[in-house]
Structures are given as C-alpha cells and as structure tokens.
A protein has these predicted regions:
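Intrinsically disordered, low-complexity N-terminal regions enriched in serine/proline/glycine
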Residues: 1, 127-128, 237
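Structured extracytoplasmic
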Residues: 26, 38-213, 217-225, 288, ...
Length: 297
C-alpha cells in the first residue's frame, strides 16, 4: 500500500492533469517458514509397493542370468578428469601456453561445472557366463590408454581405487557391493519393501517402451541404500527398462564423495532383457583435502 497524502486544491484554478506522487508504506515482515505437511508412508494398499512386488516376482523371468549360458562382447571406456577445473586459461601463466586444453573440457554430471579430462582407458573384451555350475570368464581382446593413464597404471593408488569403484554390479541381486560395503538392492527379494519407500511419479516413454517412473529412497536416510528411479515396462512383463542409483550424501564411503550408476536394458527376441548401456559417474579424492577427481565409465 501507500502512505495517505493530502493536497489542497485552489478553487477557480485548473486542477486537471495533476500528478500526485505517493510514497509506499514501509513495513517489516517477520521471518516466515513454510513446511510441507509430512504424509505418513504406508505399505498397505500402496500401488507403488504392489508394483515393486510384481517386478521382483518377475525378475528371474526377465534377466538374462536365468538362461543356462550366454556370451557377449563388452566395450568399456573409462575417463579420468580434474573436477571443477577453471576454464579461464588466460589468467594462468602456465596453462595459457596450452590453448588446446580447451578441447578436452567436459561437464560434470553432478554439478554442471567444467572438468578437464587427463586420461582415457578403453577395453574390448568377451564375457562368458554359465549358470550351473556358476562360472564367469572375461577375455580381453584389446586395450588402449591415452593421457597420463600409463603413469597411473602401477597396480596401486588411483588405478586400484578405480578398479574397486567400477566393479560390475547386478541390480537384480539382493545386495550390491560398493567399496567393501553391501547396499540393499531396490529389487531385493528379501528386504526391498521394508528397506525402501517407493513412489509412483509418472508414466513416460523410455527408448520406445512405455514405462512407470518409480522413485525410491531408503526408509532410514543413514542406511546403506540407494536413492534413485526404476523405469518399469507397462506391457505386463514388469521388466526393468532403466535404473538410476545414487549413493546418499550423508553416508561415509571413505574417499568417494558422490557416486551415480545408470543402467539401461533392451529386450532380446527370446523375451529376456539384457544390459545395453551402463554409465557410472564418481567424484573422489586420492587424499582428502587434495584436488578432487571425476571419473566416468
């Protein structure tokens, strides 16, 4: 509002086109805190819980590990970068001599800040699997290293840390090992519905398949569980089309600050689903307090 203002009008004189300037009313607003109403989570008659139960019941029918045996070709590309890199090279007397560095700049998946890729490692291999007796074998056919990766490839330090981070995971297992810790899978046959809260968010198209977007969070935010999304097909097979896994910010993973895993699956002619694409992103330190590194597989 505005402060009240009185103006004297003189009779016998023109008073049209009169401009009156009003001063806004000055007032203070005390601090206002808005808190959303916290709804109680219930598992009974919860469509999200019923959906995840059906996904778990069908997981052995849909995953390729249910087959007696299979083999596949695997291509992996691991890039290691300096995180939160300042792209303004002109202010750095040393780096401004190397203008080509800008060609190796990328963007972090975590915060959108620039990163500088310093090494790239590529592997091409054949993977063999047998269900009973269970056996797995990987034969490397070709490998290539670029950048400072050869310096790091000493069987220890950064190399061993990266190997520990990027160990292959199976979302359908009851437990998923991450850095010597065992995380409960959101598809665990034994603990899923008691360990996690599930929420149906939306229906959407994922790679040509209509899916339910199912969000999940640990019931206890300090437990070793993931936050993320499951995209479940709506064709009656309850197959996992895509999964996003994030480690919670308030748990201790030693030298790892952030970790995200993305997997996307495709259906084969025999109706089983196989892993088609996988991306793992991680922020970590070699030594706490030093330059943070960013890795992407």
């Amino acid at each position: 509002g505005y402060d009240t203002k009185f103006i004297d009008l003189k009779p016998g004189k023109k008073n049209d086109n009169l401009e009156v300037l009003l001063k806004p009313t000055a007032f203070e607003i005390s601090e206002v805190v808005v808190k959303p109403k916290r709804e109680k989570y219930t598992r009974k008659d919860n469509p999200a819980v019923e959906l995840i139960k059906k996904v778990i019941a069908h997981k052995n029918d849909n995953q390729i590990e249910a087959k007696p045996e299979y083999q596949t070709e695997v291509y992996e590309k691991l890039s290691l970068s300096l995180d939160n890199f300042n792209p303004n090279l002109d202010k750095n007397k040393f780096l401004k001599k190397f203008k080509f560095i800008k060609n190796y700049l990328d963007t972090s998946e975590f915060n959108g800040k620039p990163i500088l890729t310093v090494s790239v490692r590529e592997n091409l291999s054949d993977f063999y699997y047998r269900k009973s007796p269970k056996a797995e074998k990987t034969i490397v056919r070709a490998k290539r290293m670029q950048g400072i990766d050869k310096t790091l490839d000493d069987g220890g330090g950064i190399t061993s840390n990266l190997e520990e981070i990027f160990k292959s995971i199976n979302i359908f297992d009851n437990n998923i090992p991450i850095l010597l810790n065992r995380f409960v899978s959101p598809l665990s046959s034994t603990l899923a519905t008691t360990y996690y809260h599930y929420y149906i968010m939306d229906t959407l198209d994922v790679g040509g398949d209509k899916c339910v977007d199912l969000a999940f969070v640990p019931a206890n935010s300090e437990s070793y569980g993931f936050t993320g999304r499951l995209y479940i097909t709506l064709d009656g097979n309850y197959a996992v089309k895509k999964v996003l896994l994030n480690t919670p910010a308030n748990i201790n993973l030693n030298w790892v600050d952030k970790l995200r895993i993305e997997q996307e699956f495709k259906q084969m002619p025999d109706s089983t689903w196989v892993l088609d694409q996988e991306n793992t992103f991680v922020n970590f330190y070699v030594v706490k307090g030093t330059q943070q590194l960013y890795a992407h597989l």
